[in-house]
């Protein structure tokens, strides 16, 4: 420290007077000494001392965090060990009981009768068989036909790789250029004019669950079930047919029920389109009614043409002041098949909304296949299953194989009997996006292709944004709230896309052109498989 001597405290300085004013003169011994080197050294020591204190504090925090993690691991280990110990004790007690009990000699097996020996036992109860196109062989499926078929295309990667068309190529290129994208989906095949199996699984799973309810309770039924109930109720009301009492009866003769509904929908003049009219708080927040209510706003369904048709037929009559109120056919069917927990759709409008959207998917599917003609061979066909599957693909010997001209709705009838019914029988809760992922993709692409006759090339990646967001949330961020928001946004886009297709002057031509330009479809056979698979793979020589 520096010494500051203040001599003026001990001895008064002489005063100098000039013109009657007193001035104090400094004492020559009042001197402040400052050493530059000492000041720098002190500053350096202070900085080192501060750094040392920060390091000590950081080490203490790290030690506390490590102690916390170790304590948590120890508690988890103790918990798991106790569970294992308990299970071992249970097994030990069971073994002791078996050892104490008398051993019974096995009796010789009884000879089987000829009829019993000729009937093979099927142990795979979770396996079912579907057929997509007339004349094609059936496919044995465990849970997801499109995923299992796509997985079988990557067995000869040294010779050829599957390619899925312009839409999937653009999606793959943009995905590989994104800064934030799951590392496990960045396969080497994505850079070889193909799409990796993991990325295809992620995309197809996202598309297939676009209309799935990610939260529900006992009052909900799937959108597919809602659509089937409404279509059957409309058919029973119009034809006086008996009300179905089993789920299988909902699927019986679906082509006739849907065909009559499409015919009446074409001739119906009510409704302004195929869009809902939500209020501001209903627009983008959630599919569910606002404020935890069971109904939407008063004019929510007023502009939708399907709702207008159902209301005009008397199926959705909710007038409580009627002298002789009509029987609620929809509620009768849901109560009979799905139980008494399902409320009437007029009061619980979630099921009504998702059912109407699912009917739109069925209508587009029916329109695309209404006049389809499936030929045995076609020079311009994209999908060649015999090339993709090799010797496993053998043509069927059904009677439809040699048929030249198919009647109106006959191809959809075949698809219903051989694909829709087996799939829904195996799992009654699948959404329509799972049944028809191709229609979901057409709906999404219709928003990016507002006018297919204009020579515009869409170079933006915004059309894949919602799909990428869901994939990122599932694989990387894993935030439930953000995942729910992304799924809701994708579901709204599907709704808007379906409306965009059905309001077109020619929905069939509009949708078929999207399949041709974006996915490579050329004929009705390609369209049929695209509706079911959501893609049209071809064999591409490996680079």
From Swiss-Prot:
It comes from Saimiriine herpesvirus 2 (strain 11). Residues 1-54 are annotated as: Interaction with major capsid protein/MCP. Its main location: virion. Keywords: Capsid protein, Host nucleus, Host-virus interaction, Viral genome packaging, Viral penetration into host nucleus, Viral release from host cell, Virion, Virus entry into host cell. Coiled coil: none annotated. Residues 101-120 are annotated as: Disordered. Capsid vertex-specific component that plays a role during viral DNA encapsidation, assuring correct genome cleavage and presumably stabilizing capsids that contain full-length viral genomes. Participates in the interaction between the capsid and the tegument through interaction with the large tegument protein/LTP. It comes from the Viruses. Disulfide bonds: none annotated. It is found in: Virion; Host nucleus. This is Capsid vertex component 2. Heterodimerizes with CVC1. Interacts with major capsid protein/MCP and triplex capsid protein 1/TRX1 at the pentamer vertices. Interacts with the large tegument protein/LTP. Pfam families: Herpes_UL25.
């Amino acid at each position: 420290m520096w010494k500051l001597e203040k001599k003026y405290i001990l001895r008064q300085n002489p005063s100098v007077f000039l013109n009657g004013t007193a001035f104090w003169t400094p004492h020559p011994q009042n001197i402040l000494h400052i050493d530059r080197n000492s000041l720098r050294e002190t500053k350096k020591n202070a900085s080192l001392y501060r750094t040392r204190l920060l390091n000590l504090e950081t080490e203490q925090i790290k030690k506390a965090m490590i102690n916390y993690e170790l304590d948590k691991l120890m508690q988890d280990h103790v918990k798991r060990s106790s569970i294992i110990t308990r299970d071992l004790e249970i097994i030990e007690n069971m073994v002791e009981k078996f050892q104490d009990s008398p051993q019974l000699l096995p009796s010789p097996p009884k000879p089987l009768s000829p009829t019993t020996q000729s009937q093979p036992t099927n142990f795979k109860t979770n396996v079912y068989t579907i057929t997509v196109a007339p004349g094609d062989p059936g496919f044995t499926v465990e849970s997801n036909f499109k995923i299992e078929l796509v997985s079988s295309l990557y067995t000869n990667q040294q010779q050829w790789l599957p390619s899925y068309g312009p839409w999937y190529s653009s999606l793959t290129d943009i995905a590989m250029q994104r800064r934030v994208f799951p590392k496990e989906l960045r396969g080497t095949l994505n850079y070889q004019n193909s799409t990796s199996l993991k990325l295809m699984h992620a995309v197809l799973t996202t598309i297939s669950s676009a209309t799935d309810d990610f939260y529900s309770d006992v009052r909900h039924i799937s959108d597919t079930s809602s659509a089937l109930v409404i279509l059957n109720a409309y058919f029973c009301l119009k034809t006086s047919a008996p009300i179905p009492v089993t789920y299988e009866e909902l699927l019986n003769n679906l082509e006739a029920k849907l065909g009559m509904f499409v015919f009446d929908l074409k001739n119906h003049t009510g409704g302004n389109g195929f869009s809902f009219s939500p209020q501001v708080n209903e627009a983008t927040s959630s599919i569910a009614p606002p404020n935890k209510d069971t109904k939407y706003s008063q004019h929510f369904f007023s502009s939708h043409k399907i709702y207008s048709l159902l209301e005009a037929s008397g199926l959705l009559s909710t007038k409580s002041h009627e002298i002789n109120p009509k029987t609620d056919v929809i509620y009768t069917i849901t109560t009979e098949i799905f139980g008494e927990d399902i409320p009437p759709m007029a009061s619980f409008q979630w099921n009504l909304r998702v059912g109407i959207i699912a009917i739109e998917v069925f209508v587009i599917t029916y329109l695309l296949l209404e006049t389809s003609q499936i030929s045995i061979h076609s020079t311009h066909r994209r999908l060649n299953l015999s090339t993709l599957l090799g010797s496993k693909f053998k043509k069927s010997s059904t009677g439809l194989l040699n048929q030249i001209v198919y009647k109106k709705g006959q191809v959809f009838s075949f698809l219903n009997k051989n694909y829709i019914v087996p799939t829904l029988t195996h799992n009654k809760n699948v959404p329509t996006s799972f049944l028809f992922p191709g229609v979901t993709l057409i709906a999404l692409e219709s928003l990016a292709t507002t006018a297919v006759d204009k020579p515009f090339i869409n170079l933006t990646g915004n059309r894949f944004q919602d799909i990428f967001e869901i994939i990122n949330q599932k694989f990387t961020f894993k935030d439930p709230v953000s995942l729910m928001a992304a799924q809701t946004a994708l579901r709204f886009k599907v709704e808007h896309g379906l409306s965009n297709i059905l309001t077109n002057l020619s929905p069939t031509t509009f949708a078929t052109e999207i399949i041709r330009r974006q996915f490579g479809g050329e004929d009705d056979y390609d369209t049929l498989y695209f509706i079911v698979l959501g893609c049209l793979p071809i064999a591409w020589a490996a680079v």
